[in-house]
Amino acid sequence: MFKILLVCALVALVAANENPEVKELVNDVQADGFVSKLVLDNGSAASATGDVHGNIDGVFEWVSPEGEHVRVSYKADENGYQPQSDLLPTPPPIPEAILKAIAYIQAHPSKE
């Protein structure tokens, strides 16, 4: 039994690939902005573009330990860092009673 466990541990160690190979690397910095891209052989990748105003658009992605492909796109500008992904939490919907109250208040403004 111990030998089977040892063989399984060795197979898992070899398959872990702690040092992935770089498949593509681009770093292009110009006076009017930059382009950066990194792609690894384990499914991880990151890319970004930026302009002279400090605005950056980018994407980073990887494969989770569960085998799920995770992708996050983002924008960074004067409004801050704004990530978007299906895996990020979202706020709950506004309750119907609150929506009705807001509509009533807008339809009946105060007389002051």
Swiss-Prot record:
An example Gene Ontology biological process: chitin-based cuticle development
Quick check: keyword Calcium in the entry?
no
Function, as annotated, reads: Component of the larval cuticle.
- Report which superkingdom the organism of origin falls in: Eukaryota
Gene name, per UniProt, is: Lcp4
> Where's the Chitin-binding type R&R domain?
31-92
Per the UniProt entry, the signal peptide is 1-16
Give the protein's recorded name.
Larval cuticle protein 4
Q: Name one GO cellular component term.
A: chitin-based extracellular matrix
Keywords on record: Cuticle, Signal
GO MF annotations in UniProt: structural constituent of chitin-based larval cuticle
Q: Which organism does this record belong to?
A: Drosophila melanogaster
